[in-house]
Amino acid sequence: MRMMYIDGGKELIRLLKAVHEMGVAVSVDMAMFEESTEAGLQDWNELLKSVIPYIDFFVPSVEELCIMLERDCYHEWNERSQGADVTNFLDIEKDVRPLADRLLSYGAKVILIKCGTPGIYFRTADKEQILKIGGGIGEEIADSWSNQEAFEKSYLVEKDKVASGTGAGDTTIAAFLSAILAGKDWQDALHLATATGALCVQTYDALSGIIPLEDVQKKIDAGWEKKKINFFQLIVFLKNF
């Protein structure tokens, strides 16, 4: 993966640009790095500014995104959490939304920021940008997808049923993309995504918890409760949503 970030991400830009020009929708996730490594010493802010225009669905974790765009802020988050899970101490309005704002200014179209146990933050660009998604999505869908913002809380999983977090983020995004390909609207896609992530954490590996989207929907329809997130600062956000 080293070739994807050296030289200002030149190889990654070349690859994404080529795929984008083929009219294919592109989804990109990120990976965490140690600050002292070669990857950690790259100018990720400039790299993302260069590659974002060629990405249709950008789906990083909030920690990955912050360490790339706002290193000092990332350090402050860790001090705030005192060694606990950072995502349990974040404020959407103050911590998460500004990162999405930055991505939109770089030309992002659809943003999903994985926020750990609390859930996922969803944000989209205006209609002009949404219409640029590879493969074309049409005027009607573009209208319903443009200028959207939401925080989708995780589904409740009892503590004694949590086995491992392995693959939870990846399966969440896979379910979201699969739901879109199946013709679901963004709201239903978010429900299916968070539900799939919740199923994943109930197994020790990344794949055993995966079930067909139709079966995931049945669990949701049966009244699966959402996680109660008292510590996650949603009040200001929800007032503006």
Question: How should these model regions be labeled?
Answer:
Residues I67, V162-D185, L190:
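Short, small-residue alpha-helix embedded
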Residues L69, I180-L181, C200-V201, I220:
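Hydrophobic residues in alpha-helical segments
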Residues K114-T117, G165-G167, A195:
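Short glycine/serine/threonine-biased micro-segments
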Residues M1-D160, L207, I211-G223, K227-F241:
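Ribokinase/PfkB-type carbohydrate-kinase core domain
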